Amino acid sequence: MQDFFPILYAGLPEVAGVLRSVETIDGVDGNAITLYIHRPATATGDVPAILHLHGGGMALLAAVDEQFVRWRDELAARGVVVVGVEFRNAGGALGPHPFPAGLDDCTSALLWLHAHRAELGVSKIVVSGESGGGNLTLATALRARRDGNVDAIDGVYAQCPYISGLYADPPSQLASLRENDGYFLERWSIAVTASIYDPEGRHGSNPLAWPYHAGTDDLTGLPPHAITVNELDPLRDEGLAYHHKLRAAGVSSTCRVIVGTSHAADVIFRAAIPDVYASSARDLVGFAYSL
């Protein structure tokens, strides 16, 4: 997979008008967390910030990977500050760090960003991520609510979230796990990734590990959400279900189905479907400015 993404981005022009910097903060386990900060070069006054939590099933890939650098640049060029988090994941280059290490790092990054709003010129904070990053996005909001830090988040934008953990034997209400199996994403592979994230299987119903299992008491009082799903994604129905749970709990939530696309296609295939990619970038930035 590491070799797959550079091919997709080869030959694309650089994104203009973006300033980049790097910060290192301390994690709860004494670990260092690298933050990649992308700012619009022409910003005047405070602008929204997006805390970006990258995809990879909470087990693979890294914030420094080309596809995620590109996404942060594209968002920043549209007028927001973007902070990418190099969180520990369950099977990546930083070593095997299963749940809850990655969530701990995302929470640390959120609290750092909230504490540095004025310094960074940030008006609002949106937590956002795709796939496994969508899991961490929703879990970060759930944890912030549980810990009394929900005021640090102004909005939540989760793309194709990987949140049920029910991949070995999908329930009937998550029909897309069977109907869309093999469209870019295969169910056996996401079941393996889930087992890497929770190797002893002790957190299968813990909403902080798998937000699909959150109940009304977990969701009530959360900030506005936006959920996007891909029509041909095995994960489609769990994202839709989470949106409905949010609405039932009285949380403001919108949902967007990206028709004719496979898992995360709107944030991966920049060259092949540039109009869809641009639409998703605009929608995320528009959500941040709407808060």
PLM feature spans:
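Ser/Thr- and Pro/Gly-biased, low-complexity intrinsically disordered regions
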Residues: 1-3
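Alpha/beta-hydrolase superfamily serine-hydrolase fold, recognizing
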Residues: 5-291
